[in-house]
Amino acid sequence: MLSTLIKKLKIKPKQISLYKMSITHSSYANENKLKKKDNERLEFLGDAVINLLMADYLYTKKEKENEGFMSKKRAQSVCEDSLVIYAKSIQLQNYILLGKGEKNKNINNSILANAFEALFGAIYLDLGYYIAKKVFILIVIPRLSNIIDNIDFKTQLQELVQSQKKTISYYITEEKGLDHSKEFTAEVFLEKKNVGRGFGKTKKSAEQDAARYVLNILSKGEKND
């Protein structure tokens, strides 16, 4: 069973015991009296590895973005919900070793996300950063754009301006193109002052793009303060 998972990762392990440990939940280890053989320590390491891999990717591929904005993207891309998406793409839930009590339940998102982190901890320990990066590119990157695209910039901006007791408004100021290929322009007003604009194929996406732009500008201002 573990060999099938290894094939999906397209790697050649040196220490197979690390990969077995990465999918061993504490309930299974306790039940089978496997001292220090659960995946919790690997999870700790894997969390740091995945954060570094994501930071590396964003720094390299998103040259125009500032530190504050990249931090927001990284946080969204490595949160529990995102880790679960990556884990399910390789059916990791089918390989996790659980105690009898846990087997009677559905594997929850926390267990699945933790196992995914532990798996990257194992890859890093066994094969190093370069191979961990190759697996990251194989599993994470193809799904990353959808996750980043689904960041709700309008809500983030709304929460920010509300904390400053200000109001924000959006207006669609331009609509061009044919029905099947329209492009909309949205402008953002903070306390009646035009602070940015965005573009999109729908009104909603144009407003999200405008909010993204303003957040980027505001985060630059915070960094300079």
From Swiss-Prot:
Mg(2+) binds at E43, N114, E117. Homodimer. It is an enzyme of class 3 (hydrolase). SMART domains: DSRM, RIBOc. GO terms for biological process: mRNA processing; regulation of gene expression; rRNA processing; tRNA processing. It comes from Phytoplasma mali (strain AT). Keywords: Cytoplasm, Endonuclease, Hydrolase, Magnesium, Metal-binding, mRNA processing, Nuclease, RNA-binding, rRNA processing, rRNA-binding, tRNA processing. Belongs to the ribonuclease III family. Residues 152-220 form the DRBM domain. This is Ribonuclease 3. One of its GO terms (molecular function) is rRNA binding.
